[in-house]
């Protein structure tokens, strides 16, 4: 369960970073 939470948290962080990078590219 702890590993799942860690993976989900890392996925959310990665998604947020990818989203921010995408916004920078558009701007």
Swiss-Prot record:
Its EC number is 1.1.1.37. It is an enzyme of class 1 (oxidoreductase). It comes from the Bacteria. Keywords: NAD, Oxidoreductase, Tricarboxylic acid cycle. GO terms for biological process: tricarboxylic acid cycle. GO terms for molecular function: L-malate dehydrogenase (NAD+) activity; malate dehydrogenase (decarboxylating) (NAD+) activity. It catalyses: (S)-malate + NAD(+) = oxaloacetate + NADH + H(+). NAD(+) binds at residues 9-14. Belongs to the LDH/MDH superfamily. MDH type 3 family. Catalyzes the reversible oxidation of malate to oxaloacetate. This is Malate dehydrogenase. It comes from Rhodospirillum rubrum.
